[in-house]
């Protein structure tokens, strides 16, 4: 099953790619590689969601925000390539959690 068909089957609608908050592009293609700009969680109105996991943000809310970021990345990928079905392999992904120093529930 294709990636696009799977999203449709799951009823997942990808969000709009967030507008850059500085002078950068949401993606760059170099040869046959796609590089995506970093993403942070945003609400349905595009407002940046902040806070530290383990303090202002619960683990459950952090999972919800991580899902939002994942969908934003898929949306940026679709914008860059025209279809998620053009993705062959993910070579590297860096993920960061803004958490309190003693957070251990990764």
Place the predicted regions along the sequence by residue.
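Short, polar/acidic, helix-capping and beta-turn segments at strand->helix junctions
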Residues: 1-106
């Amino acid at each position: 099953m294709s990636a696009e068909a799977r999203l449709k089957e799951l009823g997942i609608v990808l969000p709009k790619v967030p507008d850059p908050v500085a002078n950068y592009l949401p993606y760059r293609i170099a040869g046959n590689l796609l590089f995506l700009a970093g993403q942070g969680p945003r609400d349905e109105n595009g407002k940046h969601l902040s806070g530290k996991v383990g303090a202002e943000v619960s683990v459950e809310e952090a999972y919800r925000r991580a899902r939002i970021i994942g969908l934003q990345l898929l949306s940026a990928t679709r914008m860059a390539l025209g279809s998620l079905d053009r993705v062959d392999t993910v070579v590297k992904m860096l993920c960061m959690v803004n958490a309190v120093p003693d957070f251990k529930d990764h």
